[in-house]
Amino acid sequence: MKILAIQNRMGIGDMVIFLPFIEAISKKFNSPVSILVKENSKALEYLEKNKYIEKILILERGNNNSHHDGIIGSFNLAKDLKKYSFEKVFIFNSSLRFHLICKIAGIKEIFQYPLFQKKQQHLIKTAQNFIKKELDMDIDSNPIIELENSLIENAKNKYNINSDQINILLGIGGSGPTKRISAYKFLNFMKMATKEDDCKFFLATGTNEEEQIILNEILNSEFKERCVPLDKIKIKETLPIIKNCTVAICNDSSFSHLSAALDIPTIVLLSDTPLMYGSYSPNMYPIIPDGEETVTHDTLGKERINPEKIFKIFKEIVT
């Protein structure tokens, strides 16, 4: 059976969050599912070997002349999808556009969120209700990314990862300046951690200028000999490194989602993002700004993330 799932939200985090629901479709019909996703989901880097996913199709949208943009782009997308002869499609949004595209593509069975109800949709609960309604399945929010043991062992050898040390992923990047906790906060935690334990730190970030400033501040600190930067390698190559870690401490970034999905206890520093993004997985331990009962967009609390709270949860995890 040829089945398509459309997940058009941006970013790695959203793609990871939707994994359990896509896998549920595959299990229900005993058939791998193809997915249509945006390029910035980076799905090809961490889902290529997922047994529940057959093909990863890229939605080419984003600027005015992209292949799938506008009215002409809609017909281009319908034409592209028609080549695969999909029998069913599950659309994880309320867009009439995607509904019509799938009709034009000749897909007979179309399952979709209620049309025109995008406002105030809860990211996870809406997906859970959708799968319950269409497939009568109750799905927990616990994404899992599996890796081959050989990849994990190769990374352990290549990066001299010692199991006698506490190996810590520090996800110091973030999708915006209000989500990036200062280097000072991470250094404060590192000082507390190394006073009590032999630690090694893997610094995960992108190449954005501000992220590089934070990275270099840590690399130029007293802990530089304990640090391994990961900014120059692909996400695909970071996964087995992360899997070798004892714990992850991350801003709200792609790495908080990836590490939790790799079954690594992940402390998520939420300064300006809805709490749900750092608490949906049982592997996540959210920390919010001092003085707040919750956190959302425009909380602007990165200066009130407390390193002592990070250290307290860290010790609870590693002891």
Which residues are covered by each model-predicted region?
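Catalytic machinery of carbohydrate-active enzymes
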Residues: M1-T319
